[in-house]
Structure formats: C-alpha cells, structure tokens
Amino acid sequence: ELRTATLFLSEQDIATSLPVPMHGRVDQVYKTKRGVLIPLDTKSRPMTRVYESDIIQLSVYRIILLHQYNVPVANYGYVRTVTETSTGERVRYIKTKLLSERKVVKLWRRYQSIRSGLVTPSCTCGGDFHSTSR
C-alpha cells in the first residue's frame, strides 16, 4: 500500500486547535492513490514491537491531519521499526489500528486533569493495551 502511495509530508510540524489543541512533528505521511492520508512514525529499538505510546502518538497525528488538511485519513497508521541485528539493520513496517477521535480527546482531557493536579494518575485504557485479568 505504501509502495504505491506518494510522500505527502516528511519531518513536518503539524497542529490543530480542534477538537482540542494538539501538535506534533510527524515523521512521514503518505497519500494513497485514492487520496487517503496514512501517518507513519519510525522507531529505533532493540526489538520489533508497537507500544501504547506509539498508538497514541499516531492517533494524535491522525486527528491533527483530519482537522488541518480536511481530507480523509486512514483509521490506521504504520510504525516503522529499525532494529540492529548481527548482519545490519532490520526494518519492519507494522500496520497499527489507531484510536478514535473521541478516545484521543478523552486522553487529552485526562492528561490536562493530571497536569493540573485535579486527578491522580491511574490506568484508564480499559484493557485496550494490556490484559485486565490478573
């Protein structure tokens, strides 16, 4: 899919004030032949893995792109992992389902409440990122 897409943005600062103020520096955004934007973030790490923070970061980029460019944005993105191996670097593209705008706004509001001291931090993912059974 990315092979046939064109590079839309690279190492670009993006921001929006709607639905809440958000900003970031997206690694790459690709535009498919159908005109849909797909965010991509590159991570150098010891193993090929997608973290909760990666999903949140790409989800924020998705919401910003929706509001800044007013064009369709995929509900998924890609995490490109770069890992060192004995024979050199290994690069993997991991397609990742992103959070809805509603969930991103909810996380933003919780973050603001924690920053202002109104709320004590605790897990709120509802099991989206880990098992809730112990």
Protein language model features and the residues they cover:
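Basic, amphipathic alpha-helical patches used to engage nucleic acids or provide basic targeting signals
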Residues: S53-I64, V71-N75
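Active-site metal-binding core of divalent-cation-utilizing nuclease and nuclease-like domains
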Residues: L2-R34
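A broad structural signal for short, well-ordered beta-strand segments within beta-sheet-rich domains
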Residues: L2, L7, V36, I56, ...
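Conserved catalytic cores of phosphodiester-cleaving nucleases, focusing on short active-site segments
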Residues: M22-T48, Q57-Y61
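Generic detector of short, locally flexible boundary/turn motifs and exposed helical patches
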Residues: R3-L7, L40-P46, I94-T96
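Metal-dependent nuclease catalytic regions and adjoining charged, substrate-binding loops involved
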Residues: F8-P21, H67-R134
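Short, low-complexity, polar/charged sequence segments that are solvent-exposed and flexible
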Residues: V29, L58-R62, K97-S100, S113
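Short alpha-helix boundary/capping segments
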Residues: R49-I56, L99
